[in-house]
């Protein structure tokens, strides 16, 4: 199994990177530590919002707006981090671990939202590869999502993490460069994994051009140990 973790801050392009990788190898599967959190919040938002308002001494316009998921980032952060991670830091990790226990040995799996050191450690402990995705403004400064608290633990927990295997840095809106870099990282990971585990990728291409990955880029992940 190839396991890839994408981190770390919000709105950096992690989902774009994942989608470009899946474009190259359609068999790639996505996982997210926040999937179950979003499902729970969707089903229990009428209970959670008053609790969040009380915990933060906040009253006023409901946070859920028209969408029970994408309009409630503060509640997702609060319940996922301050509530459930306090009970068990690995609560969300264990759910993904159970899901990954059912994948086939030659599968390629991407976790799209690595935000905390224990989540990153889970990737590394399972022989995976960590990719930090960094979005920068036109002037080269780091982009921060204006709709989120930049100091929330889920945004800063990996600021000093030094165990990334790859870093993809790209300007806002430069999707051509982002795609090129994503495919280059995918190619490198497949090759590294092949050398490490003795598997043989089916196909070859020009290392200088990730779009020439041959059968790998064309959608075949027929590599075996």
Language-model features and meaning:
Residues 7-10, 95, 118-125, 132-209, ...:
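Small-molecule kinase domains that catalyze NTP-dependent phosphoryl transfer to phosphate-bearing small molecules
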